[in-house]
């Protein structure tokens, strides 16, 4: 039986120029609990093994505490692979995904995601790129566009260059701690409460300039402890139950089927 609540996570958040301490429950394993009620399942996709470039590449950043790899968000990537008429490759962002030392972990995620994106663009300049992330992974993939000043790392990681971002066809996130409500790219039931690391107006401007209203979808539901500063951990762990099909449809539309 899984232990639902492990250690407390103490995270600092800034609002209105002052700092506050927000205590949130952490989990011993997001993977195990989320898999217990996983959303739409799909058959295993055929891994792209051609000698050239797939037409589409999906870069996935896993949730906090998941083992290295794509985590549960890999189910969404696989669904897109299976449904697309194009060749689709996938890869995982290599980063700690830890709750302790969150800012350092997330910074490494943004840095490595930027490097993976740049490498893919360099190797396959005609390839459409898709970024997907869950929880801390969602924080990572949106911060590829904005930089990660909101998590207050010791050294802020800046956004990816325009030369890389111009190849990104879609970004999908679930339970992003950097969430700001009522943005054009926001979906889900939360319309009143920001995440525990809300992005600044400058970061929102970066997303707007990137074209996030068309290219990005970020799901956050009321009660989520991380994207909506709530107290319902189960809400945070079960986005794929509710939104996996919608996310797949969105990505397929952005990449051209």
Q: What does each model-found stretch correspond to?
A:
Residues 1-45:
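Secretory targeting and sorting signals
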Residues 45-47, 157-159, 204:
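A generic local structural motif
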Residues 48-128, 216-244, 248, 253-257:
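Active-site catalytic motif of lipid deacylating hydrolases and related acyltransferases
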Residues 111-132, 136-200:
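Serine-dependent carboxylesterase/thioesterase catalytic core
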Residues 164-248:
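The alpha/beta-hydrolase serine catalytic core
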